[in-house]
Amino acid sequence: MWNCRWLSALPALAAAILINGCANHGSHAVAKRQTGESVVLVGEAPANLAFAPLRSGPIAVRSTYRDGLPQTIHYQPGQDYLLDTSGQIRRTPGSRIPDFGTNMLYGKEDFRHDQFPGFGNRGFFVYVDYAHRYKWQHPLANPELGVARLPKTRQKLEAGEKVRIVAFGDSITAGGDASEPGLIFWERWTAALRVNYPRASIEITNGATGGDATVQGLQRLQEKVLQQKPDLVLIGFGMNDHNREGYGVPLDKFAENLRALIGRIRADTGAEIVLFSAFPPNPKWHFGSHNMEAYADATERVAREEHCAFADVYHYWMSLAARKKPEDLLANNINHPNDYGHWIYFQALQALGL
């Protein structure tokens, strides 16, 4: 479980976090709806939701992120689970909810995923809808890193013109473990842009490649980005760069590579750029350096210095996950977000204000 230790280093805007003991949650706050929050449950042990649910609000617990699918199982309170007012949920004896304790990676420390064929968490998630009263502000440290740095894109959208976007990065950006294409974070963001700017013609291309770090990104840039002649490029690296020595990219080289990507994109296309950070992988994974905060900070620093927009996925993720287990959000149990995790990325892009 992540904790609140990092809050002291954040500005006040980022410190309005959604957890007991760190939250701003007066009874006067407007009720909010949490949809499809994911959690895995071990035996009959309790697990935390991100927030404490309202007693009076409707609660739904099911087997799929999206409701109403042919395979969706709706779990019943008392029969399948117990949920208390503090936001703790647990399986009942004889529950139909899968027991995460039977996952092949459960309890493994410093595990190497290549030794466990078929690893993953997808069959173990339950998804919870509930209402809460927690007040929250987007953890965007500086609004100037948002839409203010995307004036050409905003102008084109408002004028109803064609806007070409390329999503560039690693397997997360490629859509890693989203259950359907429409739930990939940048697909969700594009759909929201189309609602906000109905006269504009918005095209988005998936230019991401699984397993890539910034080194491979530079090698693929011409084919995946420059040839598309984009107006806006979303750049998300760091997950593979941050891996331990011998598998990743050193921090200073990572920042240097981001600057090189930005320079080449601007020189060749004139496109505006959004950099976005990544979240911490499973801390029990052997290959992670578990220094993602430094890579997220480097991404933000490059965005500031190179006058790019910045989507702060790292702190958004940490704020929502502070009461939760890493496995609650990891579709592959390593470093791919599940559908709820893709929603967190989507929210970070929404915070740009475009």
Model features per residue range: what roles?
Residues 171-175, 209-215, 239-244, 271, ...:
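Solvent-exposed loop/turn segments at secondary-structure junctions
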Residues 20-21:
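C-terminal motif of bacterial Sec signal peptides marking the signal peptidase cleavage site
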Residues 1-10:
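Bacterial N-terminal signal peptides that target proteins for export
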Residues 176-181, 216, 245-249, 285-290:
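Short, solvent-exposed loop/turn segments at secondary-structure boundaries
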Residues 24-104, 110-139:
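Extended beta-strand solenoid/passenger and fiber regions
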Residues 236-242, 262-296:
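Active-site segments of SGNH/GDSL-like serine hydrolases
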Residues 278-354:
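Catalytic His-Asp segment of secreted/periplasmic serine-dependent ester chemistry enzymes
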Residues 134-210, 219-229, 233:
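Serine-esterase "nucleophile elbow" of acetyl-processing enzymes
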